[in-house]
Amino acid sequence: MPPRGPASELLLLRLLLLGAATAAPLAPRPSKEELTRCLAEVVTEVLTVGQVQRGPCTALLHKELCGTEPHGCASTEEKGLLLGDFKKQEAGKMRSSQEVRDEEEEEVAERTHKSEVQEQAIRMQGHRQLHQEEDEEEEKEERKRGPMETFEDLWQRHLENGGDLQKRVAEKASDKETAQFQAEEKGVRVLGGDRSLWQGAERGGGERREDLPHHHHHHHQPEAEPRQEKEEASEREEKEVEQLEHLRDELKKVTETLGEQLRREG
């Protein structure tokens, strides 16, 4: 006979007790000591012989089982049916548990998928927002750069014109000094000639003195050229100053326009 486990032996013992005690007469409720003795006897028989012999102990245990269990007095066939129903119920419970676990796993997978999709959507939205902000910043920089480039061009032109003006003024001043120096040299030469003429007049007599005013007038004639050059230089300087003032007004207008645009954008 193949070895049996404790659970299978107890189940077999109960079935054998039920089958053996079917025809046994009922007796008064036994004491705990008697039940313990009968149970030990039946277990010993099962372990040694392999089956339960019909007798007083089997009837006693059968009665006790019928009194404590709802289906204890059912027949062996009914017990088999009950056992099959129990197995079916257990299998149904197992299937239900498996289905519950599957549903839980599906719910977890679905929540995970939704979370991943949501995170991806959030990342994409963040990237789009970042690119949009970068584009807006570039547009602002371009709008700011336009007036600034115009202002820088005007300022550079102002510096270049100012440099040319300073250069021209310096050249004119140098020309003016040169002309003045030449005029002074001419005056010295004229004065020298007058002095020689004066000496000749003294030597030649008093009639020569009448020519002296004529020569003296000739001495003052070369001063007209430096005076004319001074007037022309002064006129040119006034025109250049007017140009600088006009350029300054333009720069002021551009600066005000740029400031208003920056305030509107800021």
From Swiss-Prot:
Annotated keywords: Secreted, Signal
Region Disordered, annotated ranges: 90-266
Compositionally biased spans, kind Basic and acidic residues: 90-100, 154-188, 204-213, 221-266
Signal peptide residues on this chain, from the entry's feature table: 1-23
Tissue expression pattern: Expressed at higher levels in fetal brain and skeletal muscle. Lower expression is detected in fetal kidney, liver, spleen, thymus, heart and lung.
Single GO cellular component term: extracellular region
Major localization listed first in the record, in broad terms: secreted
Localization (cell): Secreted
Protein name (database record): Coiled-coil domain-containing glutamate-rich protein 2
Organism: Homo sapiens (Human)
Lineage: Eukaryota, Metazoa, Chordata, Craniata, Vertebrata
